[in-house]
Design a protein with these regions (language model features):
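Classical protein tyrosine phosphatase
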Residues: 26
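Alpha-helical transmembrane segments and adjacent TM-loop junctions that form the membrane-embedded core
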Residues: 21, 29-39, 43-271
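Short, hydrophobic transmembrane alpha-helix segments
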Residues: 6-17
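The first (N-terminal) embedded transmembrane alpha-helix
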Residues: 1-3
Length: 271
């Protein structure tokens, strides 16, 4: 990272300078990802009844925000260079770019295998930006070395910025939805209610359905179920939980059984 930054200023290659700044954020992102993953293993307590699982999501949000800020800065610098192209030293840029490409490729492949975790996914996007930065540095140096095309450096940097914008948007969108207790992607509350009424003969009505995610791969749900036979309450709860787990992969649900009428007259409803 330090070597690449120094090389960027010496060679005047924007892709190297941008990549060095991105690598600095990567170091912070990976450290934050590791710290939040360790912290999320702690059990619950009286103040945090769900434990520290959301730390992974919060870390992903911070990582996504840093990606967005970096993409904005890279875009600005690229526009300045496009308006007034500056020469670079192609050979040192090529060497540093090849070294960075190899290192970042190894790290990205390692992180990409754990992409189901939102926090690790956001960290992998940071490294992907570094990988693309190294590749862009190689192309820019070759273009200047053989053709003298000074516009290639800021142009390729702009492409990287656009890719980072897309990655930042995805991570921020997913993490914000989880932090706001939004309905998990792919969940249809109407379908859940209808499935429960169709498959559980004891159920007369399903309402007050609320679904959210504790983390990116841990959905949770609460609902009210109206039944006609109070003696079958335990059976109904077990049946509903089994259906939720089998049909929708929800293994943590809270079911409130009602005989007639709902005691909650106000609030957010899902009928």
């Amino acid at each position: 990272m330090v070597i690449e930054l120094i090389a960027g200023f010496i060679t005047n290659a924007l892709v190297l300078i941008a990549d060095a700044g991105h690598m600095f954020l990567d170091s912070a992102a990976l450290g934050l990802a590791w710290w939040s993953a360790v912290l999320s293993q702690k059990g619950d307590d009286e103040k945090l009844s769900y434990g520290y699982h959301r730390m992974q999501v919060l870390a992903a949000f911070v990582n996504g925000l840093s990606l967005l800020i970096l993409a904005i800065w890279i875009t600005w610098e690229s526009l300045v260079r496009l308006a007034s192209p500056e020469s670079i030293l192609p050979l040192p840029t090529l060497i540093v770019g090849i070294m960075g490409l190899i290192i970042n490729l190894v790290v990205y492949r390692w992180l990409h295998n754990s992409s189901n975790n939102l926090n690790v996914k956001s960290a992998a996007l940071h490294v992907l930006g570094d990988l693309l930065g190294s590749f862009a540095a190689i192309l820019a140096s070759l273009a200047v070395l053989f053709f003298g095309w000074l516009y290639v450096d800021p142009a390729l940097t702009m492409v990287i910025a656009l890719i980072l914008f897309r990655g930042a948007y995805g991570v921020l969108k997913d993490s914000i939805m989880i932090l706001l207790d939004g309905v998990p992607p792919g969940f249809d509350l109407t379908e859940i209610k209808q499935t429960l009424k169709d498959q559980c003969r004891l159920v007369v009505d399903i309402h007050h359905v609320h679904a959210w995610s504790l983390t990116s791969n841990r959905p949770m749900l609460t609902l009210h179920a109206q039944i006609t036979d109070s003696d079958q309450s335990i059976v109904a709860v077990k049946s509903i939980k089994a259906i939720l787990k089998q049909e929708f992969q929800i293994d943590h649900s809270t079911i409130q059984i009602e005989l007639e009428g709902c005691p909650d007259e106000e609030g957010s409803h899902s009928h």
